[in-house]
């Protein structure tokens, strides 16, 4: 894989409000032990009524700029991964452009659900490597609490809100991206969806309350079958072994799912970074949250080789091997 871009900054944000397992016990028939055993989750963050995906994204970008002393004036592309945009249109990316007054930039949202962040990184790297862009801001932001059915205990225990942002800049000497592997299984879309205009999918009637609908059993089977194969293919493309990977950062869908993927891929769970325990499933945001948490804990070092793997609704997945050189 050819690359001319490097990750030069990262920022994250989560709302203040905490939704604990004990809180959920008061809302649906569940308990802390049941949730932890099945998901590994203890808490998740919830946006206020006045907070939307654009607000969370802006705060994550501000965190990036403050932490790494970055200026956004010369950003020439904004990519936002989200399934919970404030509006059908305009895009969250356009709202970000307006807020930061970035003068000359491409701006668009992409919807790849839980794989959205790795999709965004892959597209951003491709734009820079093709020499059409120089500086790309990749953002993941979700307010899943606004589209979660809090009467459905199979889904309401899972989802939380948050945002993450990464800056990509041209650097031909120390590029970040080593390899990519991706795939789509659109026939599984019925297993994880949220309706908009259509009330059927491939002739099958849909639940039309505009909340997240998930067949957890089928999604689990797909992910634990597909992601290990994807990891194997990803490593094979660059003649690498599992031992060459310093850290595995999968989408934090569910800790039990991650444990199964690790077991099938022969990746030690100790080499895995997640955000699942105290942030829940934040869809496209789980990977940047896990990365920034690892930075704060002093786990990531320059030169580390990371394997990022996003997967989810679509059904779709995209994995990346990245050299971490956040100087």
Curated annotation (Swiss-Prot):
Enzyme class of the recorded protein, top EC level: transferase
Swiss-Prot/TrEMBL domain comment: The last Arg residue of the ACP-binding site is essential for the weak association between ACP/AcpP and FabH.
Its EC number(s): 2.3.1.180
CDD domains assigned: KAS_III
GO MF term list: 3-oxoacyl-[acyl-carrier-protein] synthase activity; beta-ketoacyl-acyl-carrier-protein synthase III activity
Compartments where located: Cytoplasm
UniProt cross-references to NCBIfam families, sorted A to Z: fabH, PRK09352.1
Similarity annotation: Belongs to the thiolase-like superfamily. FabH family.
Signal sequence annotation: none
Superkingdom of origin organism: Bacteria
Record-given protein name: Beta-ketoacyl-[acyl-carrier-protein] synthase III 2
A GO CC term attached to the entry: cytoplasm
Residues at the catalytic site: 114, 251, 281
Subunit structure: Homodimer.
Keywords for this protein: Acyltransferase, Cytoplasm, Fatty acid biosynthesis, Fatty acid metabolism, Lipid biosynthesis, Lipid metabolism, Multifunctional enzyme, Transferase
Pfam families: ACP_syn_III, ACP_syn_III_C
Predominant localisation class: cytoplasm
